[in-house]
A protein has these predicted regions:
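Short, low-complexity disordered leader/linker segments with a strong preference
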Residues: 1-35, 350
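Conserved N-terminal structural module of periplasmic/extracytoplasmic solute-binding proteins
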Residues: 8, 25-91
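Extracytoplasmic ligand-binding site segments that recognize negatively charged/polar headgroups
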Residues: 37-51, 71-75, 87-223, 256
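A ligand-binding cleft/hinge motif common to bilobed small-molecule-binding domains
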Residues: 97-103, 220, 225-245
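Periplasmic-binding protein-like
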Residues: 136, 198-201, 208, 242-269
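A bilobed periplasmic-binding-protein/Venus flytrap-type ligand-binding module shared by bacterial periplasmic
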Residues: 139-146, 181-185, 260-274, 292-296
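Mature extracytoplasmic/periplasmic domains
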Residues: 268-324
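Extracellular/periplasmic bilobal clamshell ligand-binding domains
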Residues: 311-350
Length: 350
């Protein structure tokens, strides 16, 4: 079935990141439009992702057309900051700590979507400005064809076989790239120890990437052996990229670890189509859309009352078995993100 929810014009906008909305004022003057700025990962490579289905259903039910712009988590927040005096987006979807950053910068207004009471308190803002719409976890990917056995530790990645065959997205720009710092600081026991490791890893690192989603095709083709990612995005990508395998690094002698990295959505302050934005957020948290999170998107429902039992949900449960889930101090990370990224730049020379 053809999916036309993602408009070519909107998709092209992210390349230039202008200060005004795509298509000038035409979108803003059209009352049957809602504009979404989102971190990448929820749109399918072949039009078969969660966003593709959710936006199509929403358009059919409401007659409201979804204009969609995607990029790195930090990239989308930075764009919204530049447009703050003349907002172009109605809904912002990004990952921690960037959703907290957006809130701190006054980019989000309070709105409680229908069904938000079914979302865990840890997965939504206490002040009511954002909520998770898809739960997710940080992870790494490897090429299963070239590496019959996935690496298991951070230390293995320092081996010479990974020289120019390893890449992770840019901390401070990409949500999953920032997650590399968060997990390394947790696993190695602090900022200093993590930066010492990442300095060593730089010998094998191809270089920066603003988008995590663009790394998976390189891993699937064997251009890279290892990259960072997240469970939802990479599991969905593996349907069309058969060489992708998901794994979670451990310290040598330790357990593999990960942490929740939900796609969180909020209504933009001064949104040009506030009511349409509210309707879309309601739809994203509806029982139907939440049931589709695992069925179609390969992720985890944000609503606690949605118990997925489909094949994808069972496979995801097996994937997470034995992996220790820790909870980052998001307030600390949001407050000190610039400092952590600066330390990373100094350590790696990026």
């Amino acid at each position: 079935m053809p999916r036309n929810a993602v408009k070519p014009l909107a998709a092209l906008c992210v390349l230039a990141l202008p200060l005004t909305a795509c298509g000038g004022n035409s979108a803003a003057s059209d009352e049957n439009v809602v504009t979404v700025y989102s971190a990448d990962g929820l749109r399918g490579e072949n039009g078969d992702g969660w966003y593709d289905q959710v936006f199509e259903d929403f358009e059919k039910e409401t007659g409201i057309e979804v204009e969609y712009v995607e990029g790195g988590s930090g990239e989308m927040v930075q764009r919204a900051v530049r447009e703050k005096r003349n907002p172009q987006a109605d809904v912002l979807v990004t990952l921690p700590p960037f959703i907290q950053q957006a809130d701190t910068k006054g980019l989000l207004q309070k709105y409680a979507p229908k069904g938000v009471d079914r979302v865990s308190g840890a997965d939504k803002a206490a002040n009511g400005t954002w909520t998770a719409v898809v739960n997710n976890y940080f992870g790494f990917i490897h090429n299963k064809k070239e590496l019959k056995h996935a690496p298991t530790t951070w230390e293995e990645l320092l081996d010479g076989r990974y020289e120019n065959k390893l890449q992770y997205s840019t901390p401070g720009v990409a949500g999953d790239g920032t997650a590399v710092l968060i997990k390394a600081m947790h696993d190695f026991g602090g900022e200093k120890q993590a930066m010492e490791y990442l300095k060593k890893l730089q010998a094998n690192n191809v270089g920066p990437s603003a988008s995590t989603g663009k790394l998976a095709p390189k891993v699937d083709k064997g251009e890279l052996l290892v990259a960072n990612g997240d469970v939802q995005m990479n599991y969905a990508q593996s349907k069309s990229m058969p060489n992708l395998g998901i794994w979670f690094p451990a310290r040598e002698g330790g357990k593999p670890t990960t942490f929740a990295l939900p796609y969180a959505a909020g209504l933009v302050t001064g949104a040009p189509h506030t009511e349409n934005g509210k309707k879309l957020l309601d739809h994203m948290l509806s029982q139907k859309a939440q049931q589709q999170v695992s069925e179609i998107g390969g992720g985890f429902a944000a609503r606690q009352d949605v118990k997925a039992t489909d094949a994808n949900a069972l496979a995801l449960t097996r994937l997470m078995d034995g992996v220790e889930v820790f909870e980052p101090d998001w307030d600390d990370i949001e407050e000190n993100l610039t400092s952590y990224v600066d330390s990373w730049k100094e350590a790696t020379g990026n």
